[in-house]
A protein has these predicted regions:
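Short hydrophobic/aromatic beta-strand element in the GNAT-like acyltransferase core
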Residues: 57-61, 71, 103, 135, ...
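Conserved acetyl-CoA-binding loop-helix of GNAT-fold acetyltransferases
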Residues: 103-106, 112-125, 147-151
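A short beta-loop-alpha structural element at the N-terminal edge
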Residues: 12-28
Length: 179
């Protein structure tokens, strides 16, 4: 997608694989997103480690005007993920046949340039190239994210309640990429 960048130049955003040098910029952008939108709901003690979980398959960043403007990850399913089990039951496949799209965020200053859709397309392409079906969980109150997923044709599998801590229950919408 070609659009006018924040500097006023017509420069398309681009997605590329994240590297170790990007991590501090990703944490900075995540901090901006958390302050602006409250994502993630619970700020991690170690945000760099949160962006690099042991289950991570791959991750990408989006750049706009030469700056990190967004991030997305693709992971193997974990016990905390509801969508893989819902999809595998519906499709009659193993949970291992899914990949979880996660850690998607776009800097507030970079929104409106198609970066979320660009990153989603990159993660979906990678999952499918690995023979995996992309799924995701999103906090039900994150209406901007759910609007993006539905606009991209993702299918709502269910809304479930997750117990994130003894005092915190959260409604989560579970999606699967269109087949």
């Amino acid at each position: 997608m070609k659009s006018e960048s924040v500097s006023g130049a017509n420069v398309p955003p681009r997605a590329r694989q994240r590297n170790d040098r990007d991590l501090s910029d990703c944490v900075r952008v995540l901090t901006e997103v958390h302050e602006h939108d409250g994502y993630p709901v619970n700020w991690p003690d170690l945000p760099g480690a949160w962006l690099t979980p042991p289950s991570l398959i791959a991750s990408w960043v989006a750049e706009l005007d030469g700056r990190i403007a967004g991030h997305i990850g693709l992971s193997r399913s974990g016990v905390e993920d509801a969508a893989p089990g819902l999809w595998s039951t519906r499709a009659g496949t193993s949970i291992d046949a899914t990949a979880v799209v996660n850690r998607l965020f776009v800097a507030p200053w970079a929104r409106g340039h198609g970066i979320g859709a660009l990153l989603m397309a990159r993660a979906v392409t990678e999952a499918q190239a690995r023979g995996l079906h992309p799924v995701l969980d999103v906090v039900a109150s994150d209406t901007a994210a759910t609007a993006l997923y539905e606009r991209l044709g993702w299918q709502l599998l269910a809304t479930v309640e997750q117990q994130w801590s003894p005092e915190q229950k959260v409604a989560v919408r579970c999606y699967a990429a269109a087949t």
